[in-house]
């Protein structure tokens, strides 16, 4: 009996000690709105880092806050549990077609840090990097991208954020009642939160780099030109997209918002009544209404997205992006060798090539997003035929011409807008702008992920692939491959040196030539090859990455627009 009691006593003492020790080891941080308790994670090579997940940076955008600019976060009592991610914002699950996921209460961010201030005897603050997720402004969430490669050997504080998506994030009545761009204003609120609170995690608010891919890249570029974002960051990394890409600025958003109001049984003649009525409708019904503007296979990319604000007290986009002056900070811009490959791959699934071939005139204006730009049906069809002749000649759309389809999408959707953004920023700024083309194709590929049968190493890197070698993307298997590990190290070095100094890869600075400040000069960029070499290149904009094709295509559109 005594032995049994002794064993039980020791067991209770062990449990008590375990619970006490666990509680004492819980990382805690005090921010302006309250205390936060986080957890631990491990980087790619096993470094222990702190993680604080699901931190609210604004009040929930629900009920009367729906369709409002982000409201200040309210202080909480007790300790906020930051060991689990906050909900994604309501959006469409990528690849599902029509499934709505997430919650309306979604304005959360995640912070990762290798050390807290009390562990830093020198008191040095760390560089901060903020990642803005992509997803066409209608899907995605911050937690999908982790710093598990980036923080292996670098002392950075990493932040990822959620922001409102689709109709809930980008609806507009075209006036001061609902000016639009609330999703981007959410991002501004997150950047302001970082300025106020990041020191508590060991981060330096005066050394913030923002980065994003695709719609995240468009977001970063928009912050670079928005007066609302000035002074909130110090460097920018823009991957595979820009505010100059056609899909980055949504068209006819006010008319689309009225359409949704009518669809959900709301008035359509008065902006106040539209907004008040839509606030009473189920959030998921509003989110799902987005699909009415994607008539074929989730095209066009962004029916609801950034829009020029014609009214409002403080405008995020007071004019079209091309007319706004960028903030004078270092910028690193990149593009993948075959941006359009992932999209042509999706289009080829489930008999898509035949559907596109048989309905080219109807589908192409949505794929390339000029259905609203050219309102005249005959001119839209003529444009479709001109583009088909230019890219395909007399060949049908098929597996054999998949590369032609990829090139067409690359030129229109990414090549033209991204190169013009680099030239525009360089011409306006004194700070350097660097541009590179990512040409490495390994196992970390979106084509390999979604259609492994069509993929082979060394083929072509596509939209978003390079991000997989800097950030750990949720759902991707970590391959134990020597070449891919080497590329991870290479890409992390490019980012890390730029984050620290504003210059990428400082050991090879002679290869990284800034984009010329004179748009008439040769376009300077660095090519990262399949062999993982770096090549400094200077070419005419008409030649680089088929930009000549892009200009030809753009001229077709410009001509058609002038005729309408």
UniProtKB/Swiss-Prot annotation:
Disulfide bonds: 89-106, 266-277
Signal peptide: 1-23
Positions glycosylated per UniProt: 81, 269, 371, 404, 443
Keywords recorded for this protein, A-Z: Disulfide bond, Glycoprotein, Hydrolase, Serine esterase, Signal
Reaction(s) catalysed by this chain's protein: a carboxylic ester + H2O = an alcohol + a carboxylate + H(+)
EC class of the enzyme, as a word: hydrolase
GO molecular function: carboxylesterase activity
Domain of life: Eukaryota
Record carries keyword Glycoprotein: yes
Active-site annotation: 214 (acyl-ester intermediate), 339 (charge relay system), 463 (charge relay system)
EC assignment: 3.1.1.1
Matching InterPro entries: AB_hydrolase_fold, CarbesteraseB, Carboxylesterase_B_AS, Carboxylesterase_B_CS, Type-B_Carboxylest/Lipase
Functional description taken from the UniProt entry: Overproduction of nonspecific esterases is a common mechanism of resistance to organophosphate insecticides.
Entry similarity comment: Belongs to the type-B carboxylesterase/lipase family.
Something else known: This esterase confers insecticide resistance.
Name of this chain's protein: Esterase FE4
């Amino acid at each position: 009996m005594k032995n049994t009691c002794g064993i039980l006593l020791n067991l209770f003492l062990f449990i008590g000690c375990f619970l006490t020790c666990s509680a004492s080891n819980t990382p805690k941080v005090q921010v302006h709105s309250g205390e936060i308790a986080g957890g631990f994670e491990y980087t790619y090579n096993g470094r222990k880092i702190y993680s604080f997940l699901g931190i609210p940076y604004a009040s929930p955008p629900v009920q009367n806050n729906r369709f409002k600019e982000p409201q200040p976060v309210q202080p909480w009592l007790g300790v906020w549990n930051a060991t689990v991610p906050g909900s994604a914002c309501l959006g469409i699950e990528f690849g599902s077609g029509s499934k709505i996921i997430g919650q309306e209460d979604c304005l959360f961010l995640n912070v990762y840090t290798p050390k807290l201030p009390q562990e830093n005897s020198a008191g040095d603050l760390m560089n901060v990097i903020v990642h803005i997720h992509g997803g066409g402004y209608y899907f995605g969430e911050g937690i999908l991208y982790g710093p598990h490669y980036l923080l292996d050997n670098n002392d950075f504080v990493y932040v990822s954020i959620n922001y409102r998506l689709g109709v809930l994030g980008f609806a507009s009545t075209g006036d001061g009642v609902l000016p639009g761009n609330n999703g981007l204003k959410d991002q501004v609120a997150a950047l302001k939160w970082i300025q106020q609170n990041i020191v508590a995690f060991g981060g330096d608010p005066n050394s913030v780099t923002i980065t994003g891919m695709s719609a995240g890249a468009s977001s970063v570029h928009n912050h670079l030109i928005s007066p609302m974002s000035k002074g909130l960051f110090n460097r920018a990394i823009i991957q595979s997209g820009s505010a100059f890409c056609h899909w980055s600025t949504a068209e006819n958003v006010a008319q689309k918002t009225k359409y949704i109001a009518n669809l959900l049984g709301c008035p359509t003649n008065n902006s106040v009544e539209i907004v008040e009525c839509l606030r009473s409708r189920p959030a998921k019904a509003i989110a799902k209404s987005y699909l009415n503007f994607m008539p074929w296979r989730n095209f066009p990319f962004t029916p609801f997205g950034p829009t020029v604000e014609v009214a409002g007290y403080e405008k995020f986009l007071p004019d079209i992006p091309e007319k706004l002056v960028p903030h004078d900070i270092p910028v690193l811009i990149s593009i993948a060798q075959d941006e359009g490959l992932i999209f042509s791959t999706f289009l080829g699934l489930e008999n898509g090539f035949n559907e596109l071939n048989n309905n080219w005139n109807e589908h192409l204006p949505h794929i390339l997003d000029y259905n609203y730009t050219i309102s005249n049906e005959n001119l839209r069809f003529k444009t479709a035929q001109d583009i088909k002749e230019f890219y395909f000649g007399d060949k049908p759309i098929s597996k054999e011409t998949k590369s032609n389809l990829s090139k067409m999408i690359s030129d229109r959707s990414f090549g033209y807008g991204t190169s013009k953004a680099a030239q525009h920023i360089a011409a306006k700024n004194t700070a350097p702008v660097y541009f590179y083309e990512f040409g490495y194709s390994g196992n970390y590929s979106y084509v390999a992920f979604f259609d492994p049968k069509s993929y082979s190493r060394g083929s072509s890197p596509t939209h978003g692939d390079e991000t997989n070698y800097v950030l750990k993307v949720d759902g991707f298997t970590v391959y134990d491959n020597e070449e891919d590990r080497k590329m991870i190290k290479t890409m992390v070095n490019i980012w890390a040196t730029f984050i620290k100094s504003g210059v990428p890869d400082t050991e090879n600075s002679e290869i990284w030539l800034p984009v010329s400040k004179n748009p008439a000069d040769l376009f300077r960029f660095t090519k990262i090859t399949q062999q993982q070499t770096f090549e400094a290149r200077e070419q005419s904009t008409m030649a680089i990455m088929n930009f000549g094709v892009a200009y030809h295509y753009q001229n077709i559109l410009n001509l058609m627009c002038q005729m309408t």
